[in-house]
A protein has these predicted regions:
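Local sequence-structure signature of Cys/Sec-based thiol-disulfide redox active-site neighborhoods
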Residues: 20-68
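The N-terminal extracellular segments of secreted preproproteins, especially immediately downstream
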Residues: 11, 34-37, 155
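Short, conserved sequence motifs used for protein processing/export or organelle targeting and
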Residues: 58-207
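Feature targets compositionally biased, intrinsically disordered low-complexity regions
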Residues: 13, 18, 28, 187, ...
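Bacterial Sec-dependent N-terminal signal peptides
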Residues: 1-22
C-alpha cells in the first residue's frame, strides 16, 4: 500500500493582528469511526475541504482530522491517542463531529462546531484575511518509511507585540486517505481523509 503524507502546520496566537502575507486557512475536524453523525456530516465536509485544498488553485486551506477514542472503536486513534487527546483537551471537545477554522468553532445553523456549518463563504472570508507570517515547510521521508525530517522556516511579515509563550508552532503529519476493506468502526465509513498520524514534538506544539 502506498501512503501519501502531508505536513500541516499552524501558528496559534493570543493576539489578532493584520499582516502582509497570504493566509492558508487551517480546518480542524474531530471525528470517530463509530459515530453515526460523523458518517452523515463527513461526506459533504470532505468534498468542500478537498475543493479548497492542494492541488486546486488557489489552495485556500489545509484540512486535518483528529480521530477520537469515543463514542466507540477507532483504530486510527489507537495508533496515536496522546496527541489527539491533547487537541481534544485544548478545544474542550465534548462531542463529535466537531471542528474549527483557524481555531474558531464552525458557526452556522447547526450546533457550534458542527462540520455541517462550514461553507464556501466562510472559507473565502477567512482566506481574505492576511497573515502576519510566511511559513515554509520542507520534509523528507526516509526510504524505509519509518521516519521523517521536517524543517520549518518562519518569517514575520508584520510587526507583532507578543510576549513569551503567546505564539506556538504546531506541526502535524497527516495521511491523505486511509481506506479499509471493511468499516473499522460501527458507522459504516471505510474511507478517512487527512487523518493526523503524529504531531511534532507533540500535540502541545512548540513555543
Amino acid at each position: 500500500m502506498k501512503l501519501f503524507f502531508t505536513t500541516a502546520m499552524a501558528l496559534s496566537m493570543g493576539l489578532m493582528v493584520m499582516g502582509q502575507s497570504q493566509r492558508l486557512v487551517l480546518a480542524e475536524g474531530f471525528s470517530n469511526a463509530s459515530c453515526g453523525t460523523c458518517a452523515s456530516q463527513n461526506p459533504n465536509y470532505n468534498t468542500l475541504t478537498a475543493a479548497n485544498s492542494y492541488p486546486n488553485n488557489p489552495a485556500k486551506l489545509v484540512a486535518i482530522k483528529y480521530q477520537t477514542n469515543w463514542p466507540g472503536t477507532d483504530p486510527m486513534n489507537a495508533q496515536n491517542p496522546t496527541d489527539i487527546a491533547s487537541r481534544v483537551s485544548y478545544y474542550s471537545v465534548s462531542g463529535v463531529p466537531w471542528g474549527a477554522l483557524d481555531g474558531t468553532a464552525y458557526a452556522g445553523s447547526s450546533y457550534s462546531g458542527a462540520l455541517a456549518n462550514l461553507n464556501q463563504t466562510t472559507i473565502n472570508n477567512r482566506y481574505a484575511v492576511t497573515s502576519p507570517f510566511d511559513l515554509m515547510v520542507q520534509h523528507s521521508i526516509n526510504p524505509s518509511m519509518d521516519s521523517v525530517t521536517i524543517t520549518v522556516n518562519i518569517n514575520c511579515t508584520d510587526t507583532l507585540q507578543l510576549g513569551s509563550g503567546v505564539v506556538k508552532l504546531h506541526v502535524a503529519l497527516t495521511e491523505k486517505t486511509i481506506t479499509f476493506s471493511t468499516a473499522p468502526g460501527s458507522n459504516g465509513e471505510t474511507s478517512f481523509k487527512g487523518v493526523v498520524r503524529k504531531m511534532y514534538p507533540n500535540g502541545n506544539g512548540t513555543t
